[in-house]
Every structure is written in structure tokens, then in C-alpha cells.
A protein has these predicted regions:
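An N-terminally biased module of ancient metal coordination in phosphate/nucleic-acid-related enzymes
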Residues: 1-83, 376-377, 389-391, 398, ...
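Extended substrate/RNA-proximal surfaces in nucleic-acid metabolism proteins
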Residues: 4, 51-170
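Divalent metal-coordination and catalytic microenvironments
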Residues: 10, 44, 75, 91, ...
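Histidine-centered divalent metal-coordination motifs
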Residues: 10-14, 143, 201
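Histidine/acidic-residue-rich catalytic or RNA/ligand-binding cores of hydrolases
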Residues: 17-19, 51-53, 149-156, 204-216
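Short acidic/histidine-rich active-site segments
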Residues: 191-207
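Cys/His-rich short segments
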Residues: 237-305
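Low-complexity, acidic/Ser/Thr- and charged residue-rich accessory regions of DNA metabolism proteins
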Residues: 317-417
Length: 417
């Protein structure tokens, strides 16, 4: 049995559009360490300047992965690319040399590969998957259900997208608005390992690792990581951790401009045009999954690990203290004392006994407990607006749009304790 590695394999550097200028290796490593992540993707590794920065800042670890010397956080080269149908795919590579080689080959299909961290490629998903047959890498669709840039906004099945290169697909990244209960209602997806990743654009612990995968690896090497994702001996995925899907910003069908939410039939009747403001209505992940689902209920294959639903600690603290913003000084103070005392944000979120958290702050302990038990009330997100945690009273006023997700605790999920 190997050691556990909490891993976030999809994020972006400062060279992708709309990201924080603080997305540099030192800040990512510092944020990852505070969060409690052991392994993160570099993101954007086809970008030449970013690759040079990565080479400069990281050293090769004894098993061949990259390591940030100060924090000991491990990195693996990753990149997200956009194909000609605006579908996003995630690629995980063995080394910077492999990234260099892939950059050379994909340059022929891209005008912005040297300028944009998430390059656009003049090729289809099938052509990309086919080209990758000659490369050692892990490959799969990114945030598979989101309405703007995903495989299922464009196609009704993976086979439709990847065609005869279908066997090149190693995993499906679920995205923030979906979980394995959603995805396992589609039997085509049962054979794939699900990745839960943050797609972070800034290094703060409420972004980085807001979704992550817990791997068990015999050694922290690329080959063992690959074995874990392909479900071969040497490693395995033991846990997917992610946002409660209703908190994702594309969970419900909603107007992209004014955020008003619609039932699917209503949106169809309105021809996807918002009667309130004239904006475009975007199909929510939940409705898209319901369209694609061939199973009445999720049916998890034997290899599927448990899925733990959680949200960033700062958001729990802010809500527990009745503060409207997670950047409030008081939120940061409680966050710091919890993380200093118990090791990392992930430890506080899922491992530390509630009684010990109550010694720091009882209100936070109380709310965290209902999170772990899945009894918190949610106002679902949609149209680009994140969902929110709401009080019992607020939820009674809002029925039936909000609901209580129910989940078992981590100990129950993994049969521990
Ligand atoms: Zn993307
Ligand atoms: Zn609108």
C-alpha cells in the first residue's frame, strides 16, 4: 500500500486569459502547501515562457516529478487546450522535455501557442486524440458538462467527439458543477476514472484545490500516477473531493446576463432568450446530465471511489460568522488559527475532529459539521454565478429551488473508524 497524495491536476498560470498575475510557481506552491495539496499540475506547460519559468523554479525529484524546493510540493506538467469546436481537453505529461516535444508538434495547428497559456488548436478532439497516440501522456475532456467549452456542450457522447481515437481517453474531468452521482447516470462514462480538479485562476486556498483527487501511490512518479488513473497496479484513486455541484456556477439553467434561473422546458420555449433582460440562457450542467442520462439513478462501477462534497474553508468561516465576504480580516484570522493548529486546510475540512475545531470557534465547527454530514442548505448557482449556502429560513422561503444534499461522512464513505 502506498502513500496518499492529495492532487489538483488542472490550474492555469499567469499566461492564461483572466488569471491572477500571482499565478507563478512560488505562489502556487505556497498556496498548495497551505491547502494541504501534495501534488499539483503546472498548467499551461506548452507556453514557452511559462515552461522556462517552471524549469527555473522547480527541481527534479528522485522519482522524476518536479518539486518546489522550499515547500516540497510536487508538480507534474499539465496543459489545457481548446480545439476548433471550442471543446477543452486536459493533457498530463511525463516531463518538460515531453512538453517541449508536444509544443513543437502542436505549433503547426495553433496561432497562439506561444502567447496563450490555454492555446487554441485548429483540429478536432478526434484529431488531437489521434495525434496523442504517439505521445506518452494522459488525456481526457476537461470540465465535461459546462455549457460554454466542454465535450458535452458540443456532442452527445464521448465517442462522437473522439471517434476512432476513443481509446486514447484516460479520464473524464467532472468540473465544479458535477459529481460522480451526476456522471454515473451516463453508462458510457462508467469505464473512465473521474478527475476532480480546481481549474484555479488564482493561488488562494479558496480557489486552489477546491476540488482534488486523493491518490494512493506506491511512489510519487509519473508512471505510478498514470497507473492510478488507468487503474493498473501501483496506484489508485481513493477519493474524489469536490464542491457540492449546486454550488458550481453552471449548475442550473440560467440567464448568463441577469442570472435568472429557468426550468429546461421553459428555456426551450423561450428559445434560450431571457424575457427579463434579453440575455442568452445557458443550459445548466444538471439539465445537460438529465438529457444525456440513460440511467434513472447513478450506478457506480466497482472501481469508482467515494465522492466527498465540501467547499473552501474561508467560505464556511464567513458564513458561520455572518460575514458577507471571505476576504474579511476576521475570516482570515480564524482561517489562520485553524490551519496553523491543525496542519492544512484539507486537514481542517475533512480530518480534524469537530470537537477540536470547536475549541477555536464553535460557530465554524457547527457549520463544518453540517457540511461533513451534508445537511446544509444551498441556493444553486447558474449562468456563471456560484451557488450559495443559505440559512434554514432563507431556504424555506425559496423552495423548491434549494435542497439539502445528503452525504455520508468521510469515515463512513471509506469505511474507516
Ligand atoms: Zn477549460
Ligand atoms: Zn436575463
Amino acid at each position: 500500500m502506498g502513500e496518499q497524495y492529495d492532487s489538483d491536476l488542472h490550474l492555469h498560470s499567469q499566461y492564461s486569459g483572466g488569471t491572477s498575475p500571482r499565478m507563478v510557481i512560488r505562489e502556487i506552491a505556497r498556496g498548495a502547501a497551505k491547502k494541504g495539496l501534495d501534488l499539483v499540475g503546472t498548467g499551461d506547460i506548452l507556453h514557452p515562457k511559462w515552461r522556462r519559468h517552471v524549469r527555473r523554479e522547480l527541481v527534479e525529484d528522485e522519482y522524476g516529478l518536479l518539486k518546489e524546493p522550499k515547500t516540497g510540493v510536487l508538480f507534474v506538467p499539465t496543459v489545457e487546450v481548446e480545439d476548433e469546436r471550442r471543446v477543452h481537453h486536459l493533457i498530463i505529461l511525463p516531463s518538460l522535455d515531453h512538453a517541449e516535444e508536444l509544443h513543437g508538434e502542436l505549433s503547426r495547428y495553433s496561432d497562439d501557442i506561444d502567447a496563450e497559456g490555454r492555446p487554441h488548436l485548429r483540429m478536432t478532439g478526434a484529431e488531437l486524440a489521434d495525434l496523442l497516440k504517439d505521445h506518452d501522456c494522459l488525456f481526457g475532456p476537461a470540465h465535461a458538462f459546462v455549457p460554454w467549452t466542454s465535450v458535452f456542450k458540443e456532442y452527445d457522447s464521448l465517442r462522437e467527439c473522439y471517434g476512432s481515437a476513443m481509446d486514447r481517453v484516460d479520464f473524464v474531468e467532472l468540473g465544479l458543477s458535477a459529481d460522480s452521482d451526476y456522471a454515473d447516470r451516463i453508462s458510457e462514462l462508467h469505464e473512465y476514472t473521474f478527475l476532480t480538479c480546481s481549474d484555479a485562476h488564482s493561488p488562494y486556498p479558496h480557489r486552489l484545490g477546491r476540488e482534488f483527487v486523493r491518490f494512493e501511490l506506491e511512489e510519487p512518479s509519473y508512471d505510478v500516477l498514470k497507473a492510478a488513473i488507468r487503474r493498473k497496479p501501483g496506484g489508485r484513486v481513493v477519493l474524489n473531493v469536490g464542491l457540492i455541484p449546486e454550488l458550481g456556477k453552471y449548475n442550473r439553467t440560467a440567464c448568463a446576463r441577469c442570472k435568472r434561473q429557468f426550468e429546461l422546458e421553459e428555456a426551450e420555449r423561450l428559445n434560450w432568450r431571457c424575457p427579463e433582460c434579453g440575455g442568452t440562457i445557458k443550459k445548466g450542467v444538471r439539465d445537460r446530465v438529465l438529457e444525456l442520462a440513460d440511467l434513472e439513478k447513478p450506478k457506480h462501477p466497482n472501481h469508482r471511489p467515494p465522492y466527498l462534497r465540501i467547499i473552501p474553508l474561508a467560505e464556511i468561516i464567513a458564513k458561520a460568522l455572518g460575514l458577507s465576504t471571505i476576504t474579511a480580516k476576521k475570516v482570515r484570522a480564524v482561517w489562520n488559527s485553524l490551519v496553523r493548529r491543525f496542519g492544512s486546510e484539507i486537514d481542517v475540512l475533512i480530518e480534524t475532529p469537530i470537537e477540536e475545531i470547536a475549541e477555536v470557534d464553535e460557530r465554524v465547527a457547527e457549520l463544518l459539521k453540517s457540511f461533513r454530514e451534508g445537511t446544509v442548505n444551498i441556493r444553486p448557482g447558474g449562468g456563471g454565478e456560484y451557488g450559495k449556502i443559505i440559512t434554514e429560513e432563507e431556504s424555506e422561503r425559496e423552495e423548491p429551488r434549494s435542497r439539502k444534499p445528503v452525504q455520508r461522512t468521510l469515515d463512513e464513505l471509506i469505511g474507516r473508524g
